[in-house]
Structure formats: structure tokens, C-alpha cells
């Protein structure tokens, strides 16, 4: 049979405030897979994977990306994106930005600007899948750059980004002098 897929969006009549991002709470649900695409091809691929898998998937759709030219992408036929596989959106050696959803596009612009203005080569990791999480991709990037910035729209306190920053700070201490920072749209 097909997997259970629950989509959460609010294109019309959705929330006005960032405090209504609830991925931090959703990631505590046992057995749930939670995805949040940033681009159209990933949305199509993750949706296909969700429908073809057993168990249930919470599919978070950032409504700001619905008509976004930046999020547009050619979607190959029968394209699937595996759960728990992050995508390096931009290679870099000076800073790792770990992000997902709407903030991926913002981070790509910031990375480009930092390179133009200061020569910094910023790596942007789009995690795409919150649960399961591609810890290996995150750790490899942070190991390479020794600096991490987690950017998300959820709340700072108890938001999913806080968990990412804590994980990075705890699990990368053996190979870097890292101090992880987190920023969100809701302070």
C-alpha cells in the first residue's frame, strides 16, 4: 500500500507570525518522517518517496515558495528524493550554513554576497529531511569549515534549529574548535 502523507501548508488564510512554525514540536513525534523542501524538484521527489513508502510522513510546504521563481526547477520524470539525504546547494570552505525550507534561498543569497564582499566561500546545506536527518552531511561540512550557522524560521527557544545547533556543538567538539550559532526569523 501507499504511505500516509500529511501535508501542512497555509497558502490562503495561513498564519501571519513565525511563531506558528511548528516543526520543532513535530520532530518529537515517534515514528514520523518530516520533510521540508526548498525547491520544486525536491518537493516532487520527496512527495513521490513519501507516497511510495510505508509509515507516515509529515510534508511541510513553505507557502512563500509556491509561486517563487527561485524555487522553480525542472523535475525529471519519476524523480524521487531519499529520506535523510541533505543536498549541498553551494560548496564552500569558510563557513557551513545549515538550513531548510524558505531560508535556504535567503542563505544562498547571503553566501553569494559574502563571497563578493569578503571572499568567504560559504557552504550551504539544505537538509530537506528533518527526520530522518542527514547528520553525516552536516558533520562533514562543519568538519571542513570549522564554523557553523543554523538558519531557520522556527522559534529560537525549542525550535528545530536549536536542536541542530546543540547537536553540532555536542557532536563536533572532537575535531574542531567550533562554536555553533543559530539564527531564526522569530526572536
PLM-predicted stretches and their roles:
Residues 1-6, 180-183, 187:
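Short, small-residue-biased leader/transition segments that mark boundaries at the very start
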Residues 11, 63-179:
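Thiamine diphosphate
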Amino acid at each position: 500500500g501507499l504511505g500516509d502523507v500529511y501535508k501542512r501548508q497555509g497558502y490562503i488564510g495561513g498564519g501571519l507570525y513565525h511563531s506558528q512554525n511548528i516543526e520543532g514540536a513535530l520532530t518529537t513525534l515517534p515514528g514520523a518522517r518530516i520533510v521540508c523542501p526548498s525547491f520544486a524538484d525536491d518537493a516532487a521527489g520527496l512527495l513521490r518517496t513519501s507516497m511510495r513508502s510505508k509509515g507516515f510522513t509529515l510534508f511541510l510546504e513553505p507557502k512563500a515558495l509556491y509561486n517563487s521563481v527561485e524555487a522553480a526547477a525542472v523535475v525529471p520524470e519519476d524523480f524521487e528524493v531519499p529520506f535523510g539525504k541533505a543536498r549541498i546547494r553551494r560548496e564552500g570552505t569558510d563557513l557551513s550554513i545549515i538550513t531548510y525550507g524558505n531560508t535556504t534561498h535567503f542563505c544562498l543569497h547571503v553566501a553569494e554576497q559574502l563571497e563578493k564582499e569578503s571572499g568567504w566561500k560559504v557552504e550551504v546545506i539544505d537538509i530537506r529531511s528533518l527526520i530522518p536527518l542527514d547528520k553525516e552531511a552536516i558533520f562533514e561540512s562543519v568538519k571542513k569549515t570549522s564554523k557553523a550557522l543554523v538558519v531557520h524560521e522556527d522559534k529560537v527557544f525549542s525550535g528545530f534549529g536549536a536542536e541542530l545547533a546543540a547537536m553540532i556543538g555536542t557532536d563536533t567538539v572532537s575535531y574542531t574548535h567550533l562554536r555553533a550559532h543559530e539564527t531564526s526569523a522569530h526572536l
